[in-house]
């Protein structure tokens, strides 16, 4: 067995059943080539232009972070179009099985939307309105130094047959959050702002933006899962938006722009699936 370098341990696991809504924290998760089962399994699609709703354009979708989604039956969360429950800002709940689900969501958002699903069954076959082509979405770029665009909205394509922005797994270390907090002490650099799947507590002595050094390497998590770290995670306006008790704070993004090339965390592809659990060790395998 090749020597592996201990990097840390998994301290939290997250998935987001509906794109850009609040998600759910897990004790364990099954990982397939399409990421954590059930992650971004659903999305809202604009009834007028057919684009996927995302908080990346808060001017168009200012309320998405006020909605929360969870799977009704965790045992079925890997099944195609497994039913979910969505809690609206006023506390009303609606399930994906209700015939009037999209109508209820449309009224809450004051915009016609359709709740669409990407199938995540055993065959990992997409079953949505976008099975063979990339869905499109929009991103608003605030007027901020260091961004590729400023004070404008651009279109981007999601990976074919998915509702992910870029990659199927997103990792983040507590060391990065701690470092950002040192650079901007008034900012609340909490996991919720960055929406990762896997949060890693580094081994003793690990500080700073340490996951930057993982790019190009393979990570072993627990006994089964292997991830190939493909690149850094570029951040956007979503990190600045209010959610729950977190206030709007543009300096969250500005701090990342000034000190880490607008990057927080890393993306990964799945080399080998399996189950990961809170507390699992994270090692560099290659």
Which residues fall in each region the model found?
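Metal-cofactor-dependent catalytic cores
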Residues: 1-286
């Amino acid at each position: 067995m090749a020597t592996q370098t201990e990097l840390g341990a998994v301290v939290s696991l997250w998935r987001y059943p509906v794109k850009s809504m609040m998600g759910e924290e897990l004790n364990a998760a099954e990982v397939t080539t399409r990421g954590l089962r059930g992650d971004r399994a659903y999305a809202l699609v604009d009834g007028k232009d057919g684009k996927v709703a995302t908080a990346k354009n808060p001017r168009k979708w200012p309320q998405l972070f006020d909605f929360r989604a969870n799977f009704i039956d965790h045992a079925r969360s890997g099944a195609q179009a497994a039913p979910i429950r969505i809690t609206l800002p006023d506390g009303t709940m609606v399930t994906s099985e209700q015939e009037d689900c999209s109508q209820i969501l449309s009224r809450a958002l004051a915009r016609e939307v359709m709740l669409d699903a990407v199938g995540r069954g055993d065959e990992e076959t997409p079953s949505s309105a976008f099975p063979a082509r990339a869905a499109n979405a929009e991103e608003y770029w605030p007027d901020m130094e260091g961004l590729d665009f400023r004070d404008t909205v651009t279109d981007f394509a999601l990976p074919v047959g998915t509702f992910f922005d870029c990659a199927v797994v997103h990792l983040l270390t507590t060391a990065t959050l701690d470092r950002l907090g040192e650079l901007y002490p008034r900012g609340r650099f909490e996991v919720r702002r960055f929406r990762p799947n896997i949060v890693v507590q580094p081994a003793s002595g690990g500080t700073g933006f340490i996951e930057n050094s993982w790019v190009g390497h393979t990570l072993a998590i627990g006994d089964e899962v292997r991830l190939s770290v493909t690149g850094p995670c570029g951040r956007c306006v979503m990190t600045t938006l209010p959610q729950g008790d977190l206030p709007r704070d543009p300096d969250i993004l500005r701090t990342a722009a000034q000190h880490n090339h607008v990057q927080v965390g890393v993306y990964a592809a799945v080399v080998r699936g399996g189950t990961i659990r809170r507390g699992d060790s994270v090692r560099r395998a290659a």
